[in-house]
Design a protein with these regions (language model features):
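Proline-aspartate-enriched helix->loop->beta-strand connector
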Residues: 173-197
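Active-site-proximal helix-loop-helix substrate-binding element of RNase H-like nuclease domains
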Residues: 146-147, 156-160, 181, 195, ...
Length: 836
């Protein structure tokens, strides 16, 4: 079982560490002065070394303020280098927890909150909190507390408080919160609305001193952050981590949604939605006429968040990430901070001290990943191969690390093009560096081979740990089959799954940190060494496979590689199937291709990557490419825009083929949901039927489309540049993007028609929907946007241009596919049909 000693939050004020955690199974908090450790060069041999092997000795200048003054005093002084971690919170965590933090998720207090306010003076503004807070639903570890400015009645499992004035409501809520401070508070968009509005409103109603009771340390800090070109006020509640579930969802689900409103996400993930109040014309009418239902609406929002966590376990995942890196929970949103501390703690275990942060500038651009121009069209029997965790393995292969990088100018003779062409100058350059036993990256930078760098060693450690945790999880799952009532096994399965997922996320985020100018170890040469070596790897195997297949199939200079990108190649093997598998059914062909990949193509790929490794004198060969999908048909329309009819994916055979679609409008959150659904359906028909079936499908969907509401057929977009493009005379300036144009028109109409209190204006960064309009219409323009639904008071519905919407959202992207297949979207009269 987990340890009874771990932290939940570590903060700092002045010289004091503010520590909250669990000790002996019980919550504890400690406030104490902290004396950090720094390091200075030493002429003596000591147990501590720098990354470049110099001996250093520890020094304790005093408290935190003394250390800061010490670093400032000697900054830039010649011959006086100071080393160590000046993020003193993390230094403290590392001292208290030198080994892995063994935590118990069930002992961490998690609160979920949602507030509602009046909107008599318009929509509530964090910067000017004039509206009263009239309901708060607060759930702490499964127990609900509901506060309302009015009478209401909920079932017994909800502890409810009714008030006749806002001051008493806020004070009672604050007292309850203060009795048992949560470790984490979550909710939907609480970082930018619920928390800052509540804090600012409490300051206005109760006073600043009272508001500080939200913090177990009686300290709240205001912070202004930039988001979508707007400044937002947020608050740090010292000792309590604010994990906005909206941020967690955006960060860790890796799927773009057309809207990030709670209502939409709940529908996508849970098949549920917020409580509807369509029977009322406005939110103000809602709470004034049916306060009981209004409270239930507030409660439902909190219940949806809790159900989302039960399904997705994003808080559990974020805590596993935080404890793995020994950072605070909120730090999981920063790749740079997380990786900085992962490296710090890893090196500390080896008594290696880290350098000070320097103000790096990303002045120089560097090359990204390689994407081949695809062979546009339809292809039979497509097989794909992909490289396993490419960027982490490139770091391992070439031993890319700050302390292994050779201090010399990069060799501009060495490039992916030069290496692949095999010309003399790159060959001579490679031989020169190989003679010194350097590992050579594809951008001409070199790295030591006599010692493994800390970055590749750390990658290797994480990769091995992930494999270990996956095996442990599978072992527990097998035991669970034999002992289904064993609750301890449930805990172990969840724990090991989280641990392996954490390692996967960390490995995948490593390059993001390395390529960030604010990273302690940022080096543009190292970042480019990774990307260009990745380019070389994928182009090397692309060329090798083409030579191999041309030789095997007696063809000459035929390109069998339909497409390739960062870490994948897509091969057309229709010629091979025609040569070997005539008159065989699909399943027999899939068996043949599966066997050919495993016994012939994969061993060839392994041999070719070993050859590349020797050519570059790599530290080790880490390029492992495995077969991904086998599809009987594939269609490419452009770079990264394709669809495959997959029979087998990584050895999993499907009873019925499944579609894999990339880059087409079916996977774009900017396409209306109904259109995404129908495009996926029609692509399935393209794979399995004929042109006449497609034409009939188009006609049927057009009829259905024309009956839908504007909200269902409009294009989802984010708006950016509202202030830039606004014009007080003409509404919008020349060259305004269409979604911004529609938003500015909407705002002007809402204002002109006196609807500003009922409908919120669109602001910078909002998700909106826009639709084309027939002219003339009340807007005197051809477009309108709206936040969620199109207000009936604007009298716009009857002017929506359904024909243009259908063409632009559905027919145009479908034509891109049908054009490469050679099919039409409507019946075409021919001489034969005319005389029939």
């Amino acid at each position: 079982m987990p340890s009874d000693f771990f932290y939940t939050n570590v903060s700092m004020i002045g010289d004091y560490i503010l520590y909250r955690g669990i000790k002996d199974g019980q919550p504890t908090q400690i406030r104490e002065k902290y004396n950090p450790t720094l390091f200075l060069p030493s002429n003596e041999k000591t147990k501590y070394r720098t990354l470049d092997g110099k001996f250093v000795e520890p020094i304790k200048p005093g408290h935190v303020s003394d250390c800061r003054e010490f670093v400032r005093k000697y900054d830039g002084v010649q011959g006086f280098q100071v080393y160590g971690n000046t993020d003193y919170v993390y230094q403290f965590i590392g001292e208290i927890f030198p080994k892995e933090v063994d935590y118990d998720f069930n002992k961490i207090k998690i609160a979920t909150i949602d507030i509602e306010t009046t909107c008599d003076g318009g929509f509530p503004q964090v910067s000017n909190p004039n509206e009263e807070v009239i309901t708060i639903t607060y759930c702490l570890d499964g127990k609900y507390f509901v506060f309302g400015l009015g009478e209401f009645d909920l079932p017994d499992e909800y502890e409810q408080y009714s008030f006749d004035n806002e001051e008493d409501l806020l004070r009672t809520f604050l007292e309850l919160w203060n009795e048992d401070h949560p470790d984490i508070v979550t909710g939907w968009n609480i970082k930018f609305f619920d928390i800052p509005y509540l804090v600012n409103r409490m300051i206005r109603v109760l006073g600043e001193r009272e508001v500080n009771l939200l913090s177990p340390w009686k300290k709240i800090r205001s912070k202004t952050v930039q988001k979508m070109n707007r400044e937002h006020e947020t608050f740090q509640i010292m000792g309590v981590s604010v994990l906005d579930y909206l941020d967690l969802y955006r960060t860790f689900t890796y799927v773009n949604q057309e809207s990030y409103r709670l209502d939409h996400i709940a529908n996508v993930e849970l098949g549920d939605a917020k409580l509807s109040y369509d029977e009322f014309d406005s939110m103000a009418e809602f709470y004034k006429q049916d306060f009981q239902k209004f409270v239930e609406y507030n409660v439902k929002d909190v219940e949806l968040i809790i159900r989302l966590e039960e399904k997705l376990k994003l808080i559990e995942l974020s805590l596993a990430l935080a404890y793995s890196a020994k950072v605070n929970f909120e730090d999981v949103f920063s790749q740079v901070r997380t990786w900085d501390q992962i490296i710090y703690h890893y090196l500390s275990e080896q008594n290696i001290v880290i350098p000070m942060k320097t103000g790096s500038k990303k002045d120089e651009q560097y090359a990204g990943a390689y994407v081949k121009d695809p062979i546009v069209g339809q292809h039979d029997w497509v097989v794909s191969f992909d490289l396993n965790s490419l960027y982490p393995h490139l770091i391992m292969q070439y031993n890319i690390s700050p302390e292994t990088k050779i201090d010399q100018d990069k060799d501009y003779m060495i490039t992916p093009n030069g290496i692949l062409e095999g010309s003399d100058r790159p060959k001579k350059a490679l031989l020169k560096h190989k003679s010194k036993d350097y590992s050579i990256a594809a951008n001409g930078t070199c790295y030591r081979r006599d010692v493994q760098g800390f970055l590749p060693a750390l990658m290797e450690k994480m990769y091995e740990e992930r494999s270990m945790y996956k095996k442990k999880m599978i072992e527990c799952q097998k035991q669970k089959e034999k002992d289904p009532d064993n609750r301890e096994l449930d805990y172990q399965i969840a724990k090991f799954n989280n641990f392996q997922l954490v390692r996967k996320i960390q490995l995948n985020s490593a390059y993001g940190a390395i390529g960030n100018q604010y990273f302690r170890y940022f080096d543009v040469d190292m970042a480019e060494a990774i990307t260009l070596s990745g380019q070389l790897s994928i182009r090397w195997i692309q060329d090798s496979l083409n030579k191999f297949l041309n030789n095997a199939l007696d063809s000459e200079d035929k390109d069998y590689i339909i497409a390739s990108d960062t870490d994948s190649v897509y091969i057309r093997l229709g010629d091979l199937v025609d040569k070997v598998c005539k008159k065989k059914d699909d399943n027999s062909i899939v068996d043949f291709l599966d066997d050919s990949c495993e016994k012939i193509i994969e061993p060839f790929i392994e041999k070719e990557y070993d050859r590349l490794s020797r050519l570059m004198n790599a530290y080790t060969n880490k390029m492992v490419m495995g077969r991904e999908v086998i599809a009987n048909k594939g269609i490419w329309t452009a770079k990264k825009r394709y669809m495959l009819n997959v029979f087998d994916s990584e050895g999993v055979r499907f009873t019925e083929p499944k579609l894999k679609i990339m880059g087409i409008e079916t996977s774009r959150s900017s396409t209306p949901a109904i259109v995404r659904k129908k495009l996926k359906e029609v692509i399935g028909l393209i794979m399995s039927t004929d042109e006449d079936t497609i034409i009939q499908f188009i006609d049927d969907f057009r009829d259905e489309f024309n009956q839908l509401d504007p909200e269902d057929i409009s294009f989802p977009r984010s708006v950016s540049g509202m202030e830039k493009y606004e014009d007080s005379n003409t509404v919008y300036a020349k060259g305004t993007p269409i979604a911004v144009k529609g938003s500015l028109i909407y705002n002007r109409m809402i204002k002109d028609r006196g609807l500003s209190r009922k409908y919120k204006s669109i602001v910078e960064g909002d998700k909106v929907k826009f639709t084309y309009l027939k002219v003339p219409n009340p807007t005197n323009d051809h477009v309108i946007a709206f936040p969620n639904s199109l207000p009936k008071e604007l009298d716009i519905h009857r002017f929506v241009d359904y024909d243009l919407q259908f063409d632009k959202s559905f027919l145009d992207p479908l034509k891109n596919i049908l054009n490469v297949v050679g099919w039409n979207t409507e019946k075409v009269n021919t001489l034969e049909s005319f005389f029939a």
